Structures are given as structure tokens and as C-alpha cells.
Amino acid sequence: MDPESFSAAFFKWDQRPPALAPPQMQRSAGLEAQRIFHDFGVPNAAAMAASNNSSSCRKELNCLEELFRNYGVRYITLTKMVDMGFTVNTLVNMTEQELDDLVRTLVEIYRVELLVGEKYGIKSAIRAEKRRLEEAERKRMEQLFVDVDGKRKIDENALDTLSQEGLSVEEPQGDNAIILSQNNTSANFPLNLNAGMDPVLILQNSGHLGTTVSGLIGMPDTNYGSEQTKACKKQKRRRSKDSGEDGEERQREHPFIVTEPGELARGKKNGLDYLFDLYEQCGKFLLDVQHIAKERGEKCPTKVTNQVFRHAKHSGAGYINKPKMRHYVHCYALHCLDIEQSNRLRRAYKERGENVGAWRQACYYPLVAMAKDNGWDIEGVFNKHEKLRIWYVPTKLRQLCHLEKSKQSHL
């Protein structure tokens, strides 16, 4: 039989419907069709995997060609390295010893006849790629530091502007420590505040020195180190727990300097007139809170509480906060009760160049004397004054009055 006629007859399309076969024949024919469909209709998974693997190898080979382009490494050597599973990333991360082992493996195990120039070309290309990556990383870190330093300078300029406009910004550090000097105060006032009352807290500035960032190829860091930041935060929490002033008061220097009445402060720090004005603003915010509470039918606060500080912050006066206002409330009390004595104290400490911490401690003495004249009722002294009755009496002031009263009773 002619093969061509046989093929044409075999593949001729028959338009007539096929006759019904017996059930057993139909089942066998169905199984045969499924087998044929499975063998010829579905793509082979192994072929697809081989195709993907070939594409991946081709991609890695192109990367190796780009790496060793100008270093005299032959194409057959690159192909063998791809077969061994090496990529550009693995080669760059290898040490010199590992590169020697790679060359030795190519020669001894895979029987690749490397030229003398190829051995040095492989190492030279990898060293050059390492230097290129390190240089790119160094430039990226320099740009990052420049951006951070520029942002820091912008923030400092903004803080300077806000400070000159009358906004007080919290700063946890101070140029001096909070130390009560008995030599400077005992000549004017007989009371000793450090007689077993509070430990002397010294705020060290060494926690804000610039450090270097480890792991960043030895680049110096202009920001504070993470270790110093953690230590500073721990020191703040410790001072907050050890504070004898109030339950939530933290002993730290605020951005104020001792100024005479009517004197304007220069630089970032504000004067004492500005500090006393903050207490006047708190009184106005208390009136606002009382007015709102009356409109809502709620209980009106009679003293400056957390609700007043939250209202001040919501109104845009974020520079008014509880720690600062509680820290200097007795100074404001002396200013309200005896402004002449307060002004004399300010002038004296300004002439001596004392910091605001020492001036703050000295403000306790006249208040203790006033409490003595009032039968040691410091609460009554505050309640008699219209501007002071809205403030809580500091715990430290109560303790000093009790201590002085005990000394007087033993005499």
C-alpha cells in the first residue's frame, strides 16, 4: 500500500456521527482517549522546569559576563562557574581564601584549563566590584548624614524663632546641674535644704556626646549614639522616681535664665518674666475650662489640673505643660506674695551669675518664713491670694515647713 495514500486515508475527517459502541468498548475507548490526551495534550512539567532553569542560567551568565567583561575571563570558564551555582552576589561576598578554593576547584575537580591571566582576572574583578559597592554605600551614607544634619539645623532655627516669639521649648539638658549651694545661700537665709531631705542630682552632659555608628564602614555619626540615648532616658526616669517635689515632677533644667525685672533674655532661653506670664496664661485657660464645664453641666475644676493642661495643648499652647509649671510654682508664689523680695532675689542671683536652678531653690526660704508668720499654714497662704488659690502647694514646700516647724518646737 502506498504510504502517502494510507496517511491521507487515515487522517481523513469523517462528518458522519459514529455508531454507538457497547458499554465496555466505550469505557475502554474513553480510557484510551484520556491516555492520549494526557500524553500529547498537556505540556510536560519537566520541559517547563528545564526551560525556566535555562532562562535563569542565561540570566546569571549575563551577570557574570558583565562582571568579568574587561578582565580576560573566557566564556567557557563563566559557563562552568554558572554550572557550579555561583552568582555575582555569592562571588562578591566570598573571602580571599574562598576565592582561592574556587579557582582550585575549577582546575582540580572540574578540569578547567585556566589561563594564568584568568586566575588573576577573577580575583581582580571581584575586588573591583567590592570596592565599587563600598564606595556607593559610603556615598549613600554621606548623603543621608547631610540630609539629617540639614534637617537638624532647620529644626534649630525653628526653635530659635519660636523662643524669640515667646514659646518655651522643653530641653532635657542644661548647661549647669541642679545643685543647692549652702555657701551661697546660708549667708542670707538660715534654712538648710539639703539636711537629709533630697539627694543632690547632677545632670551630666556627657550623655550627649557624638559617637560613631558601628557597622557603617567607620563613618562618624553626627547624631547622638543609641547607647547614650538609652542611658539618658534611664537617668530621666530615675530622677522622676527620686523626685521629692511632686509625684509626677522631674528634676531638670528648663530653658530659662535668671533675669532682672523687665530684662529680655537672649538666645534660646527665656527670662523669668516670661515664666511668670505662663502662669497668668494658665489662669486664663482654667477660666475657659470652667466655662466649658458649665455649658456642659459638668463639674468645674477649681485648680489647675491635667484637664487645664490638655486644654492648653489643644488650644495651641503646647509650651505649657505640667512638669514645668509644677516645677516653678513656688517661685511664682513668691512673685505674687512679695514682688519686692522676689525682684531683689532675682537681681542678687543675676549679679552672682547663678543658674536658674539655684535661684529656684532660694525661692523656698521666704515662703517658709511667710508660713511661719501664718501659723505654719502654707495652704492658707496660697488660698488667701487670688492668683495662687488655683495652684496646688508643692510637696517640697510642705515638707520644708514641717521640718522647720519641728526644729522650732525642739528649741
Swiss-Prot record:
GO cellular component, one term: nucleus
InterPro entries: FLO/LFY_C (IPR035209), FLO_LFY (IPR002910), Floricaula/leafy_C_sf (IPR038276), LFY_SAM (IPR035079)
Keyword Transmembrane: no
GO molecular function, one term: DNA binding
Chain positions covered by the region annotation Disordered: 220-259
Residues the record marks as site: Interaction with DNA: K299, N306, R310, G357
Subcellular localization(s) per the UniProt record: Nucleus
Top-rank lineage group of the source organism: Eukaryota
Segments of skewed composition (Basic residues): 231-240
Start-end of Basic and acidic residues biased regions: 241-255
Tissue specificity remark: Expressed in vegetative buds and male cones but not in female cones, vascular tissue, roots or secondary needles.
Keywords (A to Z) from UniProt: Activator, Developmental protein, DNA-binding, Nucleus, Transcription, Transcription regulation
Listed GO biological process terms: regulation of DNA-templated transcription
Record keyword Nucleus present: yes
Regions recorded as binding DNA: 252-256, 321-328, 392-395
Biological role stated in the UniProt entry: Probable transcription factor.
UniProt similarity note: Belongs to the FLO/LFY family.
PANTHER family recorded: PROTEIN LEAFY
Name assigned to this protein: Floricaula/leafy-like protein
Naturally occurring in which organism (per UniProt): Pinus radiata
